[in-house]
Amino acid sequence: MESLLENPVRAVLYLKELTAIVQNQQSLIHTQRQRIDELERRLDELSAENRSLWEHQQLLQAQPPPGLVPPPPSAPLPAPAVTAPAAAAAQEPLQDHGQLIPASPEPPLQHHGQLLAQPQPAPSSRVQTPQSPHQHPVAPGAIADKEKERPSSCCAAAGALLQHASPAALGKGVLSRRPENETVLHQFCCPAADTEQKPACSDLASQSDGSCAQAGGGMEDSVVAAVAAGRPSAHAPKAQAPELQQEEERPGAVGSPRAGPLRAASPGRQQPALATALCSHTPAASEYELSLDLKNKQIEMLEHKYGGHLVSRRAACTIQTAFRQYQLSKNFEKIRNSLLESRLPRRISLRKVRAPTAESLVAEKALLEGCGLLGLPLGRSPSLPPTFAGSLTELEDSFTEQVQSLAKSIDDALSTWSLKTMCSLQESGAYQLHQALHPSAGQPGLETEAAAREPESGPGSGDEAGGLPQGHSGTLMMAFRDVTVQIANQNISVSSSTALSVANCLGAQTAQATAEPAAAQAEQEDTADQEVSEVPASEQMDPPSEDSEAAESRAQSAQEPAVAQAVVEEAVATEAEEEEEGAKQAGKGAEAEGGDNSEQLSSSSASTKSAKSSSEASAAASKEALQAVILSLPRYHCENPASCRSPTLSTDTLRKRLYRIGLNLFNINPDKGIQFLISRGFIPDTPIGVAHFLLQRKGLSRQMIGEFLGNSKKQFNRDVLDCVVDEMDFSNMELDEALRKFQAHIRVQGEAQKVERLIEAFSQRYCMCNPEVVQQFHNPDTIFILAFAIILLNTDMYSPNIKPDRKMMLEDFIRNLRGVDDGADIPRELVVGIYERIQQKELKSNEDHVTYVTKVEKSIVGMKTVLSMPHRRLVCCSRLFEVTDVNKLQKQAAHQREVFLFNDLLVILKLCPKKKSSFTYTFCKAVGLLGMRFHLFENEYYSHGITLATPLSGSEKKQVLHFCALGSDEMQKFVEDLKESIAEVTELEQIRIEWELEKQQGTKTLSVRSAGAQGDPQSKQGSPTAKREAMAGEKAAESSGEVSIHNRLQTSQHSPKLGVERGAPAPSPPTSPPPLPPDPQPSPLREQPPPLPLPPPTPPGTLVQCQQIVKVIVLDKPCLARMEPLLSQALSCYASSSSDSCGSTPLRGPGSPVKVIHQPPLPPPPPPYNHPHQFCPPGSMLLRRRYSSGSRSLV
């Protein structure tokens, strides 16, 4: 028993140590805040004095005749209170910041200008007064805009300190600190719903970043219009906006605001200048987004207007490439010059690597001592250093090192504690979590053995012991979002965040052996040769199979256009294998998510010892029951909650289609694609889960992976990038070889700001993997500069738009890196080796699905449509014969056509004579699949014929094409692929229209109501129309004292007797109800939502999915004793609630009156534990709630 529970106990010990570390860091930050308050007070005093002197000087200058006596300075005008902070910002002595920031070579006037440019917390009644001659004028509108656009953050002040910011950033943090957000998220193990509130302009910018390169293979569409017109492109401000952001935030050409791995988890990285630039150059947020076919038609019209397809596209590619290279060179020059002048904030933090087995030894020692939950000693003393600028970085490194080591230890401890392990605990009874509340005094640890509690769960007493009424004797399936680990002196138990994780929902017969629990356990086992299952993917994907890699390597060897047909066949085979693999990985369910990611604490409950052999029908029933519960959970990264209301339970074909739709959405707009895949349950809603998905799954454009990871506007994207680089090992590798490995997975190109963000994350990881290499340099930031220079060298050396005589030579490369290592030069042999290796082999990304499309496009002559797009995927290639008249016989050889079917396009080609042309195919026509209809025909002339009808753009006419095949097998395969592709593109367009309607109606501001009704998943199958039938949710702006809106229990009754007693389901709610406020006392007359469709009956066993650890709360024995009555009351409350209601709507049980039961209040928020690379200090209210009186109970 102790061996099975060793890993959870060890994880609890690590979490306990982490809590102590975070508390010490909080005390350090609290002390720093006190110093900031003192400096702020002194600043106010100096401001008042300075203002008084300034007013006095003004009065002396405007003095009337000399005979008059000027007014004494002791009686100033009322104006000193008007602009005191502004004058203080202009006249602040630099020595006041001597302990906070290092000395800067900039003149005092520049400091004054920086401080003055920051927004002031001035009330609305302030009036602008004349400024002194040396002050820079600031418009009042700019101040108001900056004050309005800056979002509140829990790390605004601490982030400015931890980054060694310039006086501008310091003044921004000191003068205008805002109330912090009290909702602290566990980014590593259990993130809750995203609480960042961002301006509409920044939302639009983040959405448009991923879509600006969707047409033309990474080239902005509107650049075509700028070729001949000579006007700036509509996308040019997007590339220039980051430069404006840097110049606004750091007038002295300071680099990125990141300081090592501890970035401030603040959504305010978008500065007012960036928001203003984007708002002035981008359309309104309510503007309708065109479909792909309309966008392609728009590009076609632009090309026709500006010189034709070839001329305009060649010019656009030249302009785009030159502009991006110019931006990269400009950024590199700025960073290099800043580093030479010692004005660059420290980006890379050099940290010592802790021994990997230290934590495990400490944990084992603590376990041998009887689980004495005393705080483990810290690596370093977190006491306040004498000088902030000299010692805070060391504390940052120590804290980050401890957090990362603990995170890895928690990973190792939780990875082996899976559903399979917990199911093995039970030999003849259920795993009852609530029995840990009644342990025996002589046994330490967890007492969950079912044998000791079998008398209590006997016939007639199993339901009464849990507080369940007799009417609910069926199996009660529950799914948890939040789980709390309660720690007493010698006893540990697991419960939900509201009351209790109930697993004692057993039937009357515990000795009855059935096959469903065994099937459920077998479904959760993560084996390599698992069959395709029916559970949609909450997967953590395995690496691609060897067959897929072999096919891909074979396709890579086919480089000549003459073998384009072989390339197509291999591409189609690879796509088929990838689809099957995606379906297999999708069927692994929540076990793979919990076991592989180590992000979710999984436990299971079974009623009896399962039989070894089980039928497939019972296995499918159990899988569907588990699937209905798991997919009904709310999701973390649902920016558009309306799209996450209806989890999809479908057949294998529809599940594959939805997965491909998610891949297409990612390749069009990465943020929307990730949102869709998370909402459908294909990937976990955690940064590490998304990172594994991006690294291991096929079908993703590497260009769009770089676009997603390089987006620094969203905190989730930055966390995913940190997790991605943490998955890569650069140990004992040269810098250019490590960068080659990084570039193989992520295409480092695009906007200069995104490239800089990717290189910065790579450099940080390289320094962590090679500390001995970094020690050879004077400054760890030299790694970042050198990596940036390598990217520039690779772009310059292999760009077709740069003439050979203008390419970068070795001496130019050495000259660019002169003096970047704190004034010293990088060793010449190192630079020469890097140059020679880049010259021999280009840095390029691995092949993806776009590679096959590009090879086909290069083998076609006269191609008028751009095929190489990130979202376009080759489905199949068939040899058909075009029929001009179905009623006449014709020679088939004269009309042979090669039909290439893509996921959104049908391209018709004919073979070229090999003697006349080096190309393989000649372009005939291309038709879109959206709106296409087809039917098969057979007559005396053509036995296997098909008619395709596609609508012509701009008219009601249709283009009709007739084809025939030689055999029925080839035609049948082509028809199946065509039918599925048409359904895929049609569903994708419906999803786009649905999102646009929701955006136009303003439903983005609403969140999903917990008690919203869920339609029939088998009938709706996740289509956009199913989302309209879901209940509208309550507003997302909840009280900051609540932890989240997701910590509710979702119950699903699976009992045939209960289903008969319930009768017909209630009528469904209206399609678009108004948003309902939370109702503390629901009316019994309110219309009940329809229950979930009941699957086939299951045994009285219970399967519990404890998805994530959110809180660690220390409870003593008295607190635990006071909680037991409340837990029993909460158990009866959940048992009487409806199967699909997560709110407070009561359910009338069979023969029982309606009762209004109040739920217990939510627990206090968790300790602030974020991703290992970040730290988010708690607010003042959080400190009072959690730490004012020591340990708190759940109630």
From Swiss-Prot:
Tissue specificity of this protein: Expressed specifically in the adult brain, but not in the fetal brain at 14 dpc.
Biased composition (Basic and acidic residues): 1026-1037
CDD domains xrefs: bZIP, PH_IQSEC, Sec7
Disordered, as annotated region: 62-139, 229-272, 440-474, 516-615, 1004-1100, 1138-1175
Gly residues bias: start-end ranges: 459-469
GO BP terms: regulation of ARF protein signal transduction
Residues recorded with modification Phosphoserine: 256
UniProt feature, compositional bias: Low complexity: 80-93, 553-574, 598-615
Stretches assigned to the PH domain: 854-987
Domain IQ: 312-341
UniProt domain SEC7: residue ranges: 648-841
Gene3D superfamilies tied to this protein: 1.10.220.20, Arf Nucleotide-binding Site Opener,domain 2, Pleckstrin-homology domain (PH domain)/Phosphotyrosine-binding domain (PTB)
Keywords: Coiled coil, Cytoplasm, Phosphoprotein, Synapse
InterPro entries named in the record: IQSEC_PH, PH-like_dom_sf, Sec7_C_sf, Sec7_dom, Sec7_dom_sf
Molecular function GO terms recorded: guanyl-nucleotide exchange factor activity
Positions with biased composition (Polar residues): 123-134
Cellular component aspect of the GO annotation: cytosol; GABA-ergic synapse; glycinergic synapse; inhibitory synapse; nucleoplasm; postsynaptic density; postsynaptic membrane; postsynaptic specialization of symmetric synapse
Acidic residues bias spans: 523-532
Subcellular location: Cytoplasm; Postsynaptic density
SMART domains: Sec7
Biased composition range(s): Pro residues: 63-79, 1066-1100, 1160-1170
Cited function: Acts as a guanine nucleotide exchange factor (GEF) for ARF1.
Subunit description: Interacts with DLG1 and DLG4. Interacts with GPHN.
Protein's UniProt name: IQ motif and SEC7 domain-containing protein 3
Underlying gene: Iqsec3
